[in-house]
């Protein structure tokens, strides 16, 4: 059976009130009729003016009211009309379309995805991050794993289109139809299409790309709509700028298809309390404007537009990395991360360890044989020079020439006055290096070459 397209639409109701059907008033009955035709399988050949048509319409209204948790009257009463006016997903809510035939699901647990193109309203990094977070919504609670691929089409292809784009479901630039997806299967199966003309955002305005993608991927994995208004898969589109948590109803339904995660996340672990004043970290990095703190098997993300940090599991994002890193840093300008443990280095792009890694730090960077681990590392944005801190010394590496600068190692305290202790971690933000020692951070101004502030690490978490 071919995949049924799952259209995500907004149905804008008229600004004036709809008449009650039983009153026989016809002024706006076509709008109600169209809504029920789109989402409740109301027969296109039915006529609202016929007695049978009125009865069928009333029955469809009762179905809609029951799903939305409204008073079941069969009338287009004000509460029902308000629900109809809300932005919503265009996937039909009743059989035969919403109850997918034989519960289509993927027959494998490792799925790939590819991003074909981008919206002009967000940077590539923000788009990629939103999509990756949307996939993690589902991988966190199932055995499913998702990996982005670049050289070929993934099992799930995400793309932005304008107008007629070849799947019979034309975008028109209006807010009534801004994305659609397809059920699991071959060909278009699982794919997600976005309207290129819409304003996609990472906040509460217009359409939040993360939230829409997470909802659409629920359909791509085989889910229909939920009658739990707090669920991600509830028909109405709502988003608030807060730390997203998947509803238990969504978890139960996706696990009915694929089973639970073999490594369930325990977010109550004491190590995950960001406001613990004594909390220390294995490694700290900047990445695409975020600050990421690694601790045991978890990491904490600080994102400027979110009021609270996000907590995730390292293995779910980077499954091929070792746990408990010694150090890590972002290579400026190339969208690459490097992680260190012992005398090994792993180079990573997206979720993938690059070919040939891990490598010995001696052969890759040119460290002497007596350097067997790295305490901290940071790549200076303006110069492309990476600073490696080991005990009381530091080395400087040129990322452009891929060689150590002559004259190193040097004493940390000599070139960074006031930093006279072991450096646990270091990052750069604007014109400052932030040096971390135990649970304290020191802000070192690169222009004045002085420490100008110190504070607890948990100030990053709005504690």
UniProtKB/Swiss-Prot annotation:
Residues 18-96 form a propeptide. One of its GO terms (molecular function) is zinc ion binding. GO terms for biological process: collagen catabolic process; proteolysis. It catalyses: Cleavage of the triple helix of collagen at about three-quarters of the length of the molecule from the N-terminus, at 775-Gly-|-Ile-776 in the alpha1(I) chain. Cleaves synthetic substrates and alpha-macroglobulins at bonds where P1' is a hydrophobic residue. Its cofactor is Ca(2+); Zn(2+). Glycans are attached at residue 370. SUPFAM superfamilies: Hemopexin-like domain (SSF50923), Metalloproteases ('zincins'), catalytic domain (SSF55486), PGBD-like (SSF47090). Zn(2+) 2 binds at residues 89, 215, 219, 225. It is found in: Secreted, Extracellular space, Extracellular matrix. It is an enzyme of class 3 (hydrolase). It holds the Pfam family Peptidase_M10. Residues 1-17 form the signal peptide. Binds 4 Ca(2+) ions per subunit. Binds 2 Zn(2+) ions per subunit. The active site is at 216. Hemopexin repeats lie at residues 278-321, 322-368, 371-419, 420-463. Ca(2+) 3 binds at residues 172-173, 195. Transmembrane segments: none annotated. Its EC number is 3.4.24.7. Belongs to the peptidase M10A family. This is Interstitial collagenase B. It comes from Mus musculus (Mouse). The gene is Mmp1b.
